[in-house]
From Swiss-Prot:
It comes from Staphylococcus aureus (strain bovine RF122 / ET3-1). Keywords: Signal. Pfam families: Leukocidin (PF07968). InterPro entries: Bi-component_toxin_staph, Leukocidin/Hemolysin_toxin, Leukocidin/porin_MspA_sf. This is Uncharacterized leukocidin-like protein 2. GO terms for cellular component: extracellular region. One of its GO terms (biological process) is cytolysis in another organism. Residues 1-27 form the signal peptide. It comes from the Bacteria. Residues 29-71 are annotated as: Disordered. Belongs to the aerolysin family. Residues 30-60 have a biased composition (Basic and acidic residues).
Amino acid sequence: MKNKKRVLIASSLSCAILLLSAATTQANSAHKDSQDQNKKEHVDKSQQKDKRNVTNKDKNSTVPDDIGKNGKITKRTETVYDEKTNILQNLQFDFIDDPTYDKNVLLVKKQGSIHSNLKFESHKEEKNSNWLKYPSEYHVDFQVKRNRKTEILDQLPKNKISTAKVDSTFSYSSGGKFDSTKGIGRTSSNSYSKTISYNQQKYDTIAIGKNNNWHVHWSVIANDLKYGGEVKNRNDELLFYRNTRIATVENPELSFASKYRYPALVRSGFNPEFLTYLSNEKSNEKTQFEVTYTRNQDILKNRPGIHYAPPILEKNKDGQRLIVTYEVDWKNKTVKVVDKYSDDNKPYKEG
């Protein structure tokens, strides 16, 4: 009987120890969860604060202490959309107020979209009646209008770039010093940086044209285009060609490879990101800039049905452009649109 009593007492003690251990574990777990929750709330609040700061930074026109000591950045944005050409210009103007430099400084980032305007057309009056119009070239042009006191000192991108993705960073340091590098990142903790990043699959970016201190031009030109299992050069008249007996003049799309196979810049369009760095003599109060976005189109002409007639390629046959003039007030650090026009049948031609 005594042994049975001892067993019961031991069993009760074991249960008590287990319960106490479980309670301790639960308490520790609850405490840890509480700590984690507090930590999470702290992180969330910190992130929300950072988010608010970013939002406020975007909303505010002036952000102090971005350029060394007492430097300021004033940001402006202008957006112009033209329905006729289906082209959108979105320009960011960053005024850099640097007390250690004797000139005004401005970074202009040219963004927006140039829609592809891909079209399949029927032209019954021609033997090669089925047409495909596709964007073979995209152009962005920036120039200072009749003002020698404002100069272009640098640009991104430079030269020729053939990679599918283009990434570059421009950095400005106090005293008018600037630098640009490939990739995304800052070169100095005391500098103000601006990045560009865009996709150009199967196209090449070339900084060409009248590039000088008042004019810069970028061309994004089709190269070897891949669609499905095919790869053909932009100069090949068999590009996107499909010889099928079911193609008719009423269904021109059937004379060409399925459009969902086309590269993104052919199928959808191009989203530019180009940067210009300018300086201005402080005696000059206002400067006008003319910005032109252009879409060049090649036309591929196929004959429907069974035949032996070769397709026809006409390069840069069509084009649409949007030209906008912006005026910068250097003293008040403001920008406004003073003129805008667009037109068809105006492909960009160098020279």
